[in-house]
Amino acid sequence: MNLPGLITIRPDQHDLLAKAAQIIGDSFIEEPWSAVWVSALDKFGADTARKQEILRASLLDELTAHARYQGAYLLEDETAAFGGYLYSELEGRTHTDLDANAPGFLDAILTPDERKALTEQAAAMERISQFDWTRVRENEGDHIYLYSWAVDKNARGKGSLRRMVEPIFAYADEHNLNCYLECYSDHLQSMYEHFGFEIVDVLSDPAFDITERRMVRRPNA
């Protein structure tokens, strides 16, 4: 998608991808799913800085993999970023396919013990980690999936989020497309409902205190 006010990051724009990964990764230290995932490193004494480094690398993998298919974006003033794609632009690939073929930035910085702990934690969280469901719900029809977004911490309260999401929703409305995302907190659910999203379903696992709220925004919501 080419969206006004947003930079569609190319795979060779490494500085912009790193900037987007920093914005989202640093914000995701507060995001419930990510916080639970990296809590697996607490037994190694991992501090916030180490967890942020890992989240940045994880996001850099995901953004770089999706940038090949117009799936990574920055506001032109670089105060907010999002990962998301128009399903038809994946050219038959899936979100899972792209994540499985990421460049390996995360793997390069992990110790063997960290890698094992995070892999085991992700497997344990599988029931509340369903991130490739929208294409099934849409019966392979076109739609927009937003897999991550965030505002730079230093730019919060300045309207960056609204300036980022308005072009996405305008495109969705113009082309009669559903938009999808997931969230894991009441606060985020309320914010997304303010933008016109509604709950599709909620996934839970008794082993974890968080729930996955899968949400849709219908055209002209």
Predicted segments — roles?
Residues 1-18, 22, 26:
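Conserved N-terminal entry element of GNAT/NAT acetyltransferase domains
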Residues 22-49:
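Helix-loop element at the rim of GNAT/NAT acetyltransferase active sites that forms part
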Residues 78-81, 187:
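Glycine-rich acetyl-CoA-binding "A-motif" of GNAT/NAT acetyltransferases
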Residues 174-175, 185-203, 208:
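Conserved active-site alpha-helix within GNAT-family acetyltransferase domains
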Residues 81-150, 156:
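Conserved acyl-donor/pantetheine-binding loop and adjacent beta-alpha core of acyl/acetyltransferases
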Residues 148-151, 157-170:
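Conserved acetyl-CoA-binding loop-helix of GNAT-fold acetyltransferases
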Residues 143-144, 171-184:
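Conserved GNAT acetyl-CoA-binding A-motif
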Residues 48-74, 141, 145:
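A short helix-loop-beta-strand connector motif used in the catalytic cores of GNAT acetyltransferases and
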